[in-house]
Structure formats: C-alpha cells, structure tokens
Amino acid sequence: MSSTDDVKQARSRVFFDITIGGKAAGRIVFELYNDIVPKTAENFRALCTGEKGVGKLGKPLHYKGSTFHRVIKQFMIQGGDFTAGNGTGGESIYGAKFEDENFQLKHDRPFLLSMANAGPGTNGSQFFVTTVPTPHLDGKHVVFGEVLSGKSVVRQIENLKTQGDKPTKDAVIADCGELSGDAAVSADTKTADAYGDEYEDFPEDEATDGQPLSASKILKIATDCKDFGNKAFKAGDLPVALDKYQKGLRYLNEDPELDNEPADTKQKLDALRVSLNSNAALMNMKLSAWDECIRSADGALAVATISDKDRAKALYRRGYAQVRIKDEDSALTSLEEAKKLAPEDGAIVNELAAVKKAAAARMAKEKAAYKKFFS
C-alpha cells in the first residue's frame, strides 16, 4: 500500500443523513483532512458523533437535529449552529471558539468542507460546503475536508428556495456519525439506486478533471435517465420518474461540442429532448402540476425538429393543463392545433369537445345574465 493510501485510510470519514421538508433526502459522506488540520478535523468528527456530551452553553455538542441555516446558490451551504440555529451560535469541543489552524488548503473547487467564522480565531461549530471554487475565502477560512459522496444531496440543498438566504424548507441533519470498517472504506464507491441510476444529479459533478462531458457521453446518460424514468413510471413511482426525466434534461442542457461527433448525434439529442420533455409533461399531468406541465410541453414544442406526432402529443398535454388553470382561450388554441395534426386521436377530440361545451355554456350563462340586467 502506498503512503498516499495510508494517509487516506487514516482520514476520518463521517456522514450526515439529511431530510428536506421532513422527507429523507439522502446521505452526505465527508472525508476529513486529519493529516493536515488535525485539530479542526477532530472538532468536526466529534461533533458528528456527539461523544463529548453537553457543552458550556448547555446544548449537546452534536450536529444531530441542526439545520443548514444559510444557503447561497453558486456559492455555498452553511450549517452547524446547534445552539441558536440562525448563524449566531455554535460551540466547538474546545470551548466557545478556537484558533485558525492553518490555511494550507485552498478553496479551489466545489464540495470542500471549510470552517465558518466571524473573523480570525473565531472557529466554533459552524461550517460550510462550497458549491463552486471560492478563492476569495483563501487565507480567511480553514479548509478541513471534502464531500466523498452525496453531492446530489448538497445540490438539493443548494437549490432550495430561500428567503434572506434561509431555506424556506428546513434542511436538517437528521442523523450523523462516524463511519468505520467496510462502511468507511466503501464510502466513496458509487452505488446505483433502485432503478439502476448511479450518475450524479448534476452534469458538472459527473465531469472528471474539470473537463466537460462529450456529446456522446451526454447522449448516453440522458438516454439512461429516460430509461430510469420509464422504469419508475411503470412501477407507479411518478415523482421519481419525473426527477429522472428532468435529470436527463439537465444533461442535455450542457450544449456539448459536436464537431468531432457522428453526424446523427445532434438529431439524437434533439429527439431525446422532445421525449424527455414530453414524458415530464405527462408526469406533471398525472401529479396535477399544471404550470410545470405547460413548461415541460413548451420545452418539447421548442425543438425545431419535433415530429407532427410528438407535436400533437405535447399540444394535447399543454392544452389539458391550460384547461385546469382556467386558461380557456389558450387551451382551445393548443387543442385545435393538436386536432389538426392528429384528427383521429380520441383523447384530443374528447378534450377539445369538452372545452368547447364548457365555453358555450359559459357564454350562454353570461348572455342570460346580461339579458336579465337590461330587462
């Protein structure tokens, strides 16, 4: 075993089990740099296990139950205030605060674990995870670890809606601790979910060595995401199916370089963009998410090479959703166009007839009301 392997084996590996809005979101596993910043790493490790008991402020020295109280997209997610919960509190295992150990490591990439502070020598329990490189923090905050797995969970937190940088849904460290034995050794091994998906949720996290994904790789991943979504749909797991289709679209949105790709790659990417958007529209229909259904259908319709069959399908799904948000005029336009493209489609014909019938009834009612008013 190399000396590098020895060092990595000696590094602590700890975990957070996260809930968002009361629902399980997944596990984040961190590797701590005990070999570079041992005091800082030990503080975090012990706060994950809770082994130090109650602190001087009367609260358990434990991250369990605390939240990510500050989230700034394209910057970082911050947590660790288990005393006040709002960024004003926290306590280290050494007392209220401890000194900056060293600034040897730089904030040169996403998914680094670093100490939050209120100035030099004010480290407590608060920490942040970078979601982009943040070089302006070098020399001011101590980097002491990195995310080994669970990057998608970090991204979920990063993408939460916020009010004054505070997430509108609570992102809670429901459980935390230290990994040991086989669990620690395998912590950085990618594992597939129930549908076979082992890709990162966001394409920038799937890329290696800072190199953008090739068009062929994006095509494969997005195709796989469609298959994962189809499996989830057949299993009746509609929210997961929707997530998989939307994940595939995130990869397609990378707009890869096509110069050195096979001639039909763009055609395949466009066809996949249509089907993923159309499938997402269907999931949103079934979940009664009408605005999202319209946006997904519009995504399919925006592809210039969409076939008449797929256009009719997307127009129907858009029209169906427009009816449900009481946008009758837009629904009529969508459904009329869909019927021109697929005049024998029973669902389109029936929905259009229902909209016209409702419109006629509304007009008759309005006419009767006006007549009564002027009589």
UniProtKB/Swiss-Prot annotation:
Keywords: Cytoplasm, Isomerase, Repeat, Rotamase, TPR repeat
PPIase cyclophilin-type domain span: 15-178
Keyword Ribosomal protein belongs to the record: no
Enzyme category, top tier: isomerase
Family annotation (PROSITE patterns): CSA_PPIASE_1, CSA_PPIASE_2, TPR, TPR_REGION
Protein's cellular compartments: Cytoplasm
Molecular-function annotations in GO: cyclosporin A binding; peptidyl-prolyl cis-trans isomerase activity; ribosome binding; unfolded protein binding
Catalytic reaction list: [protein]-peptidylproline (omega=180) = [protein]-peptidylproline (omega=0)
Signal peptide extent: none
Record's GO cellular component terms: cytoplasm; intracellular membrane-bounded organelle
Entry's EC annotation: 5.2.1.8
Membrane-crossing segments per the record: none
Function: PPIases accelerate the folding of proteins. It catalyzes the cis-trans isomerization of proline imidic peptide bonds in oligopeptides.
Subunit relationships: Interacts with CyPBP37.
Name of protein: 41 kDa peptidyl-prolyl cis-trans isomerase
